[in-house]
């Protein structure tokens, strides 16, 4: 004999096992679907036996009219049924919500790639900016305007600028040489890729030091401002238009709040650009860039539990294109700042 608790779990229409409240009544899946289908029809069913048919788990299919009437008597409401369009929209939103709540898993190969990039980055660029102080910076660059007492006499700003930029490029070269996939390419292509991407990688990594509040670069105890770049040489500095473009890029990228794996993958995408002048193995390099891009996409999607911009990947692609323009303008600027290119033969070679 069924207990009171069992009866409460049964469908109020046919007595089958209920799955929940549907359209305001506790019903089974069968009666839920029947009610939705029947009410959606323009013509209702009729009973040939004066509405006296039994509606049970076994007999429920015999008379749609009596079954519908019992649904209504049990409290099921027609006004709670969504239209086909509304139902499709709700299901689509539910599917989208499930997709967003389920982080995309990185493959083993992608995990290994990220670890390789992070390892090379840590070894060669992890403490790069803290070392700028060894290049005898002018006193005004210090955040507290107090140079360290152990420093040798300072050199002009242009000399310090040349030294730190050469140092950054050297570290970028070490970073790339630490990547097995880069070393596997012909030496000619390695040179072409480095000449094209070295400055871009410098700016991607430098972005981690950019302070949105002050619009300065904070490198260890040093602070670099837009005014410093404008007066890097006693005679002339970087053009204001170029600096505004550069600082806008850094502000936009910094606001995206990238994680370290996203920074290194972005740098790798810049490195493996198959359209650099002089590249011969374009197909192989294109495949490498696609691998970096897919890994970056997967990583971003895997972080969806964090409040991230859903257009983040698209924005990063746009910033890479913007960085390409900055790179070209930077090369022109270097050549036209008096005395600067002669102090930086490595960077002059990169930008030539």
UniProtKB/Swiss-Prot annotation:
Composed by a short N-terminal domain followed by the DNA binding, hinge, and ligand binding/dimerization domains. Residues 109-352 form the NR LBD domain. The lineage of its organism: Eukaryota, Metazoa, Chordata, Craniata, Vertebrata. This is Nuclear receptor subfamily 1 group I member 3. Pfam families: Hormone_recep, zf-C4. Keywords: Activator, Cytoplasm, Cytoskeleton, DNA-binding, Metal-binding, Nucleus, Phosphoprotein, Receptor, Transcription, Transcription regulation, Zinc, Zinc-finger. Heterodimer of NR1I3 and RXR. Interacts with PSMC4. Interacts with ECT2. Directly interacts with DNAJC7; this complex may also include HSP90. Interacts with CRY1. Interacts with CRY2 in a ligand-dependent manner. GO terms for cellular component: chromatin; cytoplasm; cytoskeleton; nucleoplasm; nucleus. SMART domains: HOLI, ZnF_C4.
């Amino acid at each position: 004999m069924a207990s009171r608790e069992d009866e409460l779990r049964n469908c109020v229409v046919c007595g089958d096992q209920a799955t929940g409240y549907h359209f305001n009544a506790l019903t089974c899946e069968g009666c839920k679907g029947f009610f939705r289908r029947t009410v959606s029809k323009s013509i209702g069913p009729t009973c040939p036996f004066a509405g006296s048919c039994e509606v049970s788990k076994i007999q429920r299919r015999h008379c749609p009219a009596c079954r519908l009437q019992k649904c209504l008597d049990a409290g099921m409401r027609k006004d709670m049924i969504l239209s086909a369009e509304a139902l499709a929209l709700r299901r689509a939103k539910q599917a989208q919500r499930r997709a967003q709540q389920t982080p995309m898993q990185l493959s083993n190969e992608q995990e290994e790639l990220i670890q390789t990039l992070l390892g090379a980055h840590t070894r060669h660029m992890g403490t790069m900016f803290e070392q700028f102080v060894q290049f005898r910076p002018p006193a005004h660059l210090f955040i507290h305007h107090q140079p360290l007492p152990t420093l040798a006499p300072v050199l002009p700003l242009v000399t310090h600028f040349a030294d730190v930029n050469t140092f950054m490029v050297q570290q970028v070269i070490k970073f790339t040489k630490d990547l097995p996939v880069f070393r596997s390419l012909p030496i000619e292509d390695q040179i072409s890729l480095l000449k094209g991407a070295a400055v871009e990688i410098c700016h991607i990594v430098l972005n981690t030091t950019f302070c949105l509040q002050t619009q300065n670069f904070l490198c260890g105890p040093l602070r670099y401002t837009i005014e410093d770049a404008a007066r890097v040489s006693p005679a002339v500095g970087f053009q204001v238009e170029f600096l505004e473009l550069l600082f806008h890029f850094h502000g936009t990228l910094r606001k995206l709040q990238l994680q370290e794996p996203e920074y290194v993958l972005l740098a790798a995408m810049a490195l493996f650009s198959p359209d650099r002048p002089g590249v011969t193995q374009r197909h192989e390099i294109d495949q490498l860039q696609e691998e970096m891009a897919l890994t970056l996409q997967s990583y971003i999607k895997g972080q969806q539990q964090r409040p991230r911009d859903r257009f983040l990947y698209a924005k990063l692609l746009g910033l890479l294109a913007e960085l390409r323009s900055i790179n070209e303008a930077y090369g022109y600027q270097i050549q036209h700042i008096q005395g600067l290119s002669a102090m930086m033969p490595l960077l002059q070679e990169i930008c030539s």
